[in-house]
Amino acid sequence: MDTLFRLVSLHHHHHHQHAASPSPPDQPHKSYPSSRGSTSSPSSHHTHNHTYYHHSHSHYNNNSNTNYYYQGGGGGGGGYYYAEEQQPAAYLEECGNGHQFYMDEDFSSSSSSRQFHSGTGAPSSAPVPPPPSATTSSAGGHGLFEAADFSFPQVDISLDFGGSPAVPSSSGAGAGAGAAPSSSGRWAAQLLMECARAVAGRDSQRVQQLMWMLNELASPYGDVDQKLASYFLQGLFARLTTSGPRTLRTLATASDRNASFDSTRRTALKFQELSPWTPFGHVAANGAILESFLEAAAAGAAASSSSSSSSSTPPTRLHILDLSNTFCTQWPTLLEALATRSSDDTPHLSITTVVPTAAPSAAAQRVMREIGQRLEKFARLMGVPFSFRAVHHSGDLADLDLAALDLREGGATAALAVNCVNALRGVARGRDAFVASLRRLEPRVVTVVEEEADLAAPEADASSEADTDAAFVKVFGEGLRFFSAYMDSLEESFPKTSNERLSLERAVGRAIVDLVSCPASQSAERRETAASWARRMRSAGFSPAAFSEDVADDVRSLLRRYKEGWSMRDAGGATDDAAGAAAAGAFLAWKEQPVVWASAWKP
């Protein structure tokens, strides 16, 4: 989930941009649009491994009729996934001809690979599995298991398609609140968990039987169960054949062919129009940032008036360090709020956004230039003095030199805010150290928005084989729970036929392949729970700042614009089992299951 848009990562390979270790030479990355731009002619320079593009303008108040590509007051757009617009023919190329391995190559099914992509519904009872093999994995005809040297006893498959799915509960908020998976009663969860346990237990006969059954039932064009079965089956196959990174590159290449700025923009806008998944975090974070600035301005003004000798100066500039993956779609609502809620002169807003890229690219720079120009025009329309800068950073976010970003422009008159929307999970290593480095910036407020899932797995060399297998089953089950909820929300929010929905679902497929088949050191799917992030923030010296009633009302008003099933829940009850630390902030819940966490923190 690697989330939809990495602030311009139109390509799937953002999965590898946040890998815990650099990809080997045989796993090249492709960078996507993410450059910088505004209205004035751009100047660029290089510092370390960052590329800067800076644009600014003074306070204009003309009524330009050029609008930013934002719709409505939800604030969102772009969520955690990667976007590309794909036509059915292109999708067949992505998941069809080049990947006909499920039935034809390894499972001796009577079906063709074309049937795998059919949209037929699941049968009311389980299909009859193929006859079990008489010997071990060395038997011919199933080379998939030959290298594993498995021994497998006779196993009867008896699955209850009417019961609850055997998905382990999350150790985070979902578990703490007793939330059940949204896919309760669905057949895919039970079959997939049985298969994951068989893979972890090296029971190759059961794996073969279950994968055959899943292959007969799965379809990327069916209902939620069929789609989940299709994506997780592809991930399991890639894991068993140790072809995860290669499969991921193939899927990314297919999606890249159909990716463009316009298609990604359309997907982002449609996603925020039909789902509060990203607007929820945007509205909550913007409210916390604005209130923090207004409080600082009011306190500074009061101190200045009470003592003529006071050195306290109310801030007149707001500088935001934006570590997010939302194509800057968060900021139009903040610009509008600054223009309408500031009692005195409208403050100057500066945004420095960090764009993670595998390598500097002209395409990335062009896209960010376009985004900057649109933001600039919208700021002029709102009458807000504004400057925008993008920093293209290659490598792990933990390696970013925050001191070199020059965030203190304006000195004492500037208030600094740090915005982390689906960004902290992109830190592959040294997460505690990175959060501590944010504390050293002495910001007025830090906003953290992350998806609620416990997908962090231990490194293979840091655990015993048994622990690694147990961790795989745990992460698999948690991933199944999380992606089931996400897919279910898409199913009920989008029309049946939608290019934007197809794009989001294909991104889910890539995220699942990454999670299931790639080594932990290379996977970009490293989400943690709210309680875990809260523990890190407290350890770094931050204290939670509760959302005000005004912000909570704004969020509730936002949710009322969407279909039933969405709600906001207090995150105070969620705890980290390992440390006993309570979370803070609020959850966006889909059918009572927490899926997105938003919080605000102060030094």
Curated annotation (Swiss-Prot):
Transmembrane segments: none annotated. GO terms for biological process: asymmetric cell division; leaf development; negative regulation of mitotic cell cycle; radial pattern formation; regulation of DNA-templated transcription. Residues 45-58 have a biased composition (Basic residues). Its main location: nucleus. Putative transcription factor involved in asymmetric cell division. Does not interact with SCR1. This is Protein SHORT-ROOT 2.
